[in-house]
Design a protein with these regions (language model features):
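Non-catalytic N-terminal regions of enzymes
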Residues: 1-175, 182, 232-237, 244-265, ...
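Short beta-strand/turn micro-motifs at beta-sheet edges
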Residues: 16-21, 213, 222-225, 280-282, ...
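Glycine-rich, charged/polar anion/phosphate-binding loops
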Residues: 277-279, 338-343, 395-397
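Membrane-interacting alpha-helical segments
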Residues: 96, 134-138, 153-169, 199-218, ...
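A compact, surface-exposed functional segment
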Residues: 255-290
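Flexible, P/S/T/G-rich "lid" or insertion loops adjacent to the active sites of thioester-utilizing
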Residues: 185-243
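Helical lid/core segments from catalytic subdomains that handle acyl or acyl-like groups
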Residues: 164-179, 189-190, 224, 284-371
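Short, glycine-/Ser/Thr-/acidic-enriched flexible segments
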Residues: 276-280, 361, 415-417
Length: 444
């Protein structure tokens, strides 16, 4: 049974620092639909079991202002929130968007929560919403699997420190010292990134960070559409188009980006593809790198070979040279909050990416968290963002797909000012793009 490494890895440290700077952060949401209801006691056991997985921890600040934070044991499981009224199954997507507005706090807790709603057709929908600082999509799926198998997944993190001792400071200092070589390399990577983006970043960064307040205003319920398709049909269509299961998901994201108007001056869509490097026994919250692919949407609905080749080239380059962005994360503890806020805006204002994550085939246990097999299972990504900021950065689009028990679930979370701001408008685009690919599907 793996033991939780007490200090955060570089990507996890960067995630929590960005969360502190922005006052918000990315979420991972996992939803199940059960046709005949569930046992309330089984749901409560599932909630308690999650506290003994990687989700049962929170972030404790380092004793040093530039040090690595620590994982410590969370005081209690996340709460269970029950919807007061029965939900029309057609509105499950809308319900997931509402759940994204509820607060999670990876530092003070709760870092996650469960939500449940009865359906008017007699079924039940259950949601697990987790701060991305606590875990990525595969970490959350792994936590569910651990509870179902009854093995707890991992040894709980150490308890919080009652007080900071001289020994604690020395330990944090040792960890910080070991990180210095990586920080030096990270600084070099940051300089290279800045040079590569010199036509964009310097002018943007010269604008005062105080000229644009971050985090204010009403948070938008970004529309969510959930799609379901048989795994056999998904695989057959991918093969017919000369692609793979993950390339088909990427192709959908490219076409959806075009349908929402998320294209550059050349008509191309920039996709951000998380690439997992999670291994057995991995206790990192976020274990991935990011591949950025720029591709024109024309022709992708009839031939995926070009997109597949572009992704392969990018992966080969990532394996050989690594990611500059990942290397640059090592300097995150030394970046002032105001600069972190502005850097995020610079990227979003000038790139307007489409985030696409294909999680692959889940273990069947992921579909039966309470012992009963769910008919549908979806993972939803995104974050609660004020409308003023969403308009400024040109909206958002996240596509997440994966399969379990013979069914592929695809979630689309998107908002585009002046084009797509309601669930109905997003559903229209999703239906149209699925039809362009010749993909049948059921939608919520």
């Amino acid at each position: 049974m793996p033991v939780v490494e007490p200090h955060l890895a570089a990507l996890d440290q960067a995630s929590v620092l960005l969360w502190r700077a922005l006052g918000r952060g990315q979420l991972v949401q996992l939803f199940w639909r059960f046709p005949d209801g569930i046992d309330p006691e089984a749901l409560e056991r599932f909630r308690g079991g999650l506290a003994h997985t990687l989700l049962g921890r929170r972030v404790e600040r380092s004793s040093l202002p530039f040090g690595r934070d620590r994982w410590v044991r969370a005081a209690e499981p996340g709460p269970l929130l029950v919807a007061p009224d029965a939900l029309d199954p057609a509105l499950i997507g809308t319900w997931t968007a509402t759940a994204a507005r509820l607060p999670v706090d990876p530092e003070d807790g709760p870092g996650w929560f469960l939500s449940v709603a009865s359906l008017t057709d007699g079924g039940v929908v259950v949601g697990l919403t987790v701060s991305h600082v606590i875990g990525d999509g595969l970490a959350v799926a792994g936590a569910v699997r651990a509870v179902v198998l009854g093995n707890g997944g991992t040894t709980p993190a150490p308890p919080p420190r009652v007080r900071v001792t001289a020994g604690d400071r020395l330990d944090d200092l040792r960890v910080a010292a070991r990180a210095v070589p990586g920080a030096v390399r990270g600084l070099a990577a940051t300089v290279r990134l800045a040079r590569e983006e010199r036509d964009v970043v310097p002018g943007s960064l010269r604008r005062s960070v105080r000229s644009r307040p971050v985090g204010g205003g009403a948070v938008v319920d970004v529309p969510v559409v959930l799609a379901r398709i048989a795994d056999t049909e998904w695989r057959a269509r991918a093969e017919a188009l000369g692609g793979s299961t993950n390339t088909l998901c990427a192709g959908l994201a490219v076409r959806l980006g075009a349908a929402l108007g998320r294209v550059d001056a050349d008509g191309c869509v920039t996709s951000s593809l998380p690439i997992s490097d999670r291994v057995a026994g991995d206790t990192r919250a976020n274990a991935n790198d990011t591949l950025v692919v720029r591709f024109h949407p024309d022709g992708v609905t009839s031939d995926l070979r070009g997109l597949r080749a572009e992704i392969r080239r990018g992966l080969a380059d990532l394996r050989e040279h690594g990611s500059l962005a990942t290397a640059a994360l090592a300097v995150a503890p030394f970046v002032p909050r105001a600069v972190a806020r502005r850097l995020e805006e610079v990227v979003l204002e000038n790139v307007a990416p489409v985030v696409c994550s294909w999680l692959g085939e889940h273990d069947p246990t992921v579909a039966r968290p309470m012992g009963v097999v769910a008919t549908d299972c979806w993972v939803v990504g995104g974050e609660p963002v004020p409308e003023e900021q969403l308009r400024r950065v040109g909206g958002a689009l996240t596509v997440v797909g994966g399969s379990v028990n013979g069914r592929v679930g695809v979630s689309v979370r998107g908002w585009q000012p002046g084009a797509v701001t309601t669930q109905g408008e997003l559903l229209d685009r999703v239906r149209r793009v699925f039809a362009e690919f010749g993909l049948p599907g059921a939608f919520h």
